[in-house]
Curated annotation (Swiss-Prot):
The chain crosses the membrane at residues 8-28. It comes from Penicillium brasilianum. This is Cytochrome P450 monooxygenase ausI. One of its GO terms (molecular function) is monooxygenase activity. It is a single-pass membrane protein.
Length: 500
């Protein structure tokens, strides 16, 4: 087990003072060797008395959006900035087309760098070439080809999850929206990840533990993180949960094998799709399944909470969406065609993603030296982020600061924009799902789950802010815009016009 490799004798010692002394020594050596851009301005640099760059890191975590804006206001297209992973490059959206399919600018290595994927216990964020290829192929090919057959089962599973997790009493009931959504999505999508009854609670704990461990470790200097990770309480908790996850997934795999042997049917789940996509190459199927489950859960829950917080304050939009659901379902039932025709709902999702994207700077890591057309050289191992600030640009989106759920619904009616205005269509002006060949490969599955979930909620519940007060929908941390998962709302069971 991971946690058993840690020397327990060290845990009771006064580690922090000792580590700080070591930090001071290493800082003097390390700070002179860090990569610094030769021909680019460096923002948010550590001052001479900024011990271990702590102030610079704190400033980036607190004010990243304003720092990035000031960088582009002052330096136009490209600049460097000190962040919580060292010095990174930031490029304007004009670079998006050069980045979109560049073979040496990778997503998974970037994620691994951001979230310590090279360290034991953080395997959920690691990048390994064979696993990365299998993950992408299984989503783009096997999952995509199976999606049509999955709509009805997903609708049934999500409907059951809502029945199990949401209030059944009449009258208004206050709920912790984030917690309810996490468990609803975990249970409703469990068939493609894990059938064990412990899965929903496990995956919620896993997501929380990884987020807390990653944030806690990021507060330490890069050169100390491998050592510090062995002692931080948040990391120790992550190790414990990862051990439990391996046991749970192993138990589920045995159950699936037995089930398939008895029925003779090939199940629709990632374990089977990984086998097909591996083409005989070796991989860690337990870690790969947890990797994709974590990525899916995080994005789905974040987006659905943002949507529902918006809807809790907009009864007219709720009414319009309900009318659309009734009309579409009566005609198409549960099908891919039905989800396509939920055009106002699709527009609402895309507008929420425009206003509050989960990341407002899309990252890549150079796995080889990269030379761009204007002469910019990105050295191997260097991360670079493309800013998504065009999503808030008045020239691109009139009245951009205003949330308009009908914005993309109207754009889809304009000649030539039927496809680009769809939720799952990334463009250089809307980087919510990334861009190019490395845009989020699971976005079609995500859109299906989100639409099915919202259909059920709209038909079965009224929703409004708790205590009549509208709180913040999101909170920002570094370059992320996270849903306010602690928000409470009031929900009331209603008699649906149609039975889904």
């Amino acid at each position: 087990m991971l946690h058993e490799t840690i020397s327990l004798a060290l845990l009771g010692q006064p580690l922090v003072p000792g580590l700080m002394v070591v930090s001071a020594i290493l800082y003097l050596l390390y700070s002179t060797q860090q990569w610094r851009p030769k021909n680019l301005p460096l923002l948010n640099d550590a001052g001479p008395f900024d011990f271990l760059q702590a102030t610079a890191v704190k400033r980036f975590r607190r004010d990243a959006r304003q720092l990035i804006k000031s960088g582009f206001d002052s330096y136009n297209n490209v600049f460097a900035m000190r962040t919580d992973v060292g010095v990174e490059l930031f490029a304007s959206p004009e670079y998006a087309d050069q980045f979109r399919n560049h073979p040496s600018l990778k997503v998974f290595p970037f994620t691994a760098k951001m979230h310590h994927g090279h360290l034991p216990g953080f395997e959920l964020c690691r990048s390994q070439p064979v696993e990365d290829r299998i993950l992408i192929e299984s989503v783009r090919t096997q999952l995509a080809q199976s999606l049509g057959k999955m709509i009805q089962p997903l609708a049934s599973d999500i409907g059951q999850a809502i029945s199990d997790r949401w209030p059944s009493e009449s009258g208004w009931q206050e709920i912790a929206l984030g917690s309810v959504i996490e468990r609803t999505i975990a249970q409703g999508t469990s068939s493609v990840y894990c059938l064990d009854e412990a899965w929903p609670e496990f995956v919620v704990k896993m997501e929380m533990a990884l987020g807390m461990a990653s944030a806690a470790l990021s507060a330490w200097p890069v050169m100390l993180r491998r050592v510090v990770a062995k002692f931080l309480p948040e990391c120790l908790e992550l190790y414990r949960i990862m051990d439990a996850g391996r046991e749970l997934m192993s138990r589920d795999m045995r159950r699936r094998v037995a089930l398939q042997a008895s029925t003779g049917e090939a199940p629709l789940n990632f374990f089977e799709w990984f086998k097909e996509a591996s083409h005989g190459e070796e991989y860690d199927e337990l870690i790969l399944n947890l990797r994709i489950a974590f990525a899916s859960m995080h994005g789905l829950c974040d987006h659905l909470v943002k949507i529902l917080l918006r809807l809790s304050e907009d009864p007219q939009l709720v009414d319009d969406l309900r009318k659309e659901v009734i009309q579409v379902y009566k005609t198409h039932g549960w099908s891919k065609t039905a989800l396509y025709h939920l055009k106002l709902m699709d527009s609402t999702f895309k507008e929420v993603q425009r206003v509050d994207p989960i990341l407002f700077a899309v990252g890549r890591l150079a796995v080889a030296d990269v030379a761009l057309k204007d002469g910019l050289i990105i050295p191997k191992g260097q991360s670079i982020r493309i800013s998504g600030h065009t999503m808030w640009d008045e020239d691109k989106y009139p009245d951009a600061a205003h949330f308009d759920a009908y914005r993309f619904y109207k754009l889809r009616q304009a000649p030539g924009q039927e496809n680009t205005a769809q939720f799952t269509s990334p463009t250089s002006d809307h980087l919510g799902f990334g861009y190019g060949g490395r845009a989020c490969p699971g976005r079609f599955f995500a859109a299906a789950v989100l639409k099915i979930s919202l259909c059920h909620v709209l038909m079965k519940y009224d929703i409004k802010p708790a205590n009549g007060e509208t709180g913040p929908h999101v909170w920002e941390f570094a370059a992320a815009i996270n849903a306010n998962m602690t928000a409470n709302v009031l929900v009331r069971r209603r008699e649906p016009e149609i039975r889904l």
